[in-house]
Amino acid sequence: MKRILKTAGTSNFKEESYYEYLNLDTLESFKELSNVKKVNLVEAMTGENGAERVKKYSVPMAAGLAYNYAAKQVDDDVLEGLKKLAKEAQLTEKYAALYNGEMINTGEKRLVLYQLTRGQLGDTVTADGVDKRAFYVEQQQKIADFANKVHAGEITNAAGEKFTTVVQIGIGGSDLGPRAMYLALENWAKKNDKFKMEARFISNVDPDDAAAVLNSIDVAHSIFVLVSKSGTTLETLTNESFVKDALKNAGLDASKHMIAVTSETSPLAKSDDYLAAFFMDDYIGGRYSSTSAVGGAVLSLAFGPEVFAEFLEGAAEEDKLAKNEDVMQNPAMLDALIGVYERNILGYPSTAVLPYSQALSRFPAHLQQLDMESNGKSVNRFGDPVNYVTGPVIFGEPGTNGQHSFYQLLHQGTDIVPLQFIGYRNNQMGTDVVIQDSTSQ
């Protein structure tokens, strides 16, 4: 069934835009793609042709990264089909609608503004009478000021002693993303004299999780970040209660050890139970919140506001690349389209994300949520059932650990599992061992 969605730009008074939202299996380009000859990857990657393919099938990303898809089961004919699919599906136009502040989340009637936490890609976006980019920057600055005061010893515990540890209390997106980013940067920060405070994370409502963290830290010198957009998240408030009891049992005033990241309308916003409150809003989904105050508070305390600002700059540069109408120069869109091809044409049910870096040990779990929580649907945006699969199962572990566990199935099992390798030229600690011209062994 063909549907056309009319969307207006809320309080920006934009002209109305019209987009066709068609089920994937009804698109002519998708049907054509189904008939394109499948690639024999072994032949394609063998000999001189393989070496040339590795050079050809690579596209630059932001901050010196590169996306190489030579080992993906595509060729020029498949790529041409994917370009047609992107055009027919109006992907570039719909992405522009997102960052220009049109109502993309029609189910909840909300804008989708996570990209504004790291930069302004298009028009000024005003919602609820507020310039949202200015709002997010204001919160980032407030977090930076707070973190700097903590690091300088201007904000201390009751004994006038500096805080040395920060503990984030959250669940889902308020845990997975910030935790992955902290672990990714921890050793780099220590190596480069950027490290300020140890960070720990509590998310599981199983009290063993909180107990293990609390037993590993000095609570008298710890500051706790409670993250709940609504201020009513059961799991998070349960863990907060556990932490407050621990602080009380240690003879400490919990309100002198806790800050909140929440919405301006939540019961936490003006509570005396917190040293400070920093705000997010309903326009940022939890799984995309690492670049908002959700990630900003814990990462700024752990590494300093300057490091968090650099993180935002890198994300903003990648966002800009995602605007490119040329699919072959748009690594984010290209990878997504190849993923659709692998799942919906080739029929591969899962994708493994394999970072050859211990620092990215929790990055696959973060990507797992980003992809599977976003695409885990059985109906389209109009509530009609879909007759095709909507996404793969995402899983992964760092190499080389995975090589000695589930890689056996990847190499010799009967299922074909697409792989996403993440490798680096150098590690964070300067202790590389070069094997076969790569330090990511």
Regions found by a protein language model. Name each.
Residues 3, 7-8:
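Acidic, serine-rich low-complexity intrinsically disordered regions
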Residues 9-159, 437-440:
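Extended, charge-enriched "interface" segments that sit outside catalytic cores
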Residues 26-29, 53, 74-82, 94, ...:
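General structural feature for long, well-ordered alpha-helical segments within catalytic domains
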Residues 36, 60, 70-72, 77, ...:
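Surface-exposed loop/turn and secondary-structure junction residues enriched for glycine/proline
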Residues 39, 43, 52-55, 63-67, ...:
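Flexible, active-site-adjacent loop/turn segments at secondary-structure boundaries
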Residues 117-129, 133-165, 173, 177, ...:
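Non-catalytic regulatory/linker segments of enzymes
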Residues 145-153, 159-325:
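Glycine-rich phosphate-binding loops that contact phosphosugars or nucleotide phosphates
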Residues 246-437:
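Active-site phosphate/pyrophosphate-binding segments
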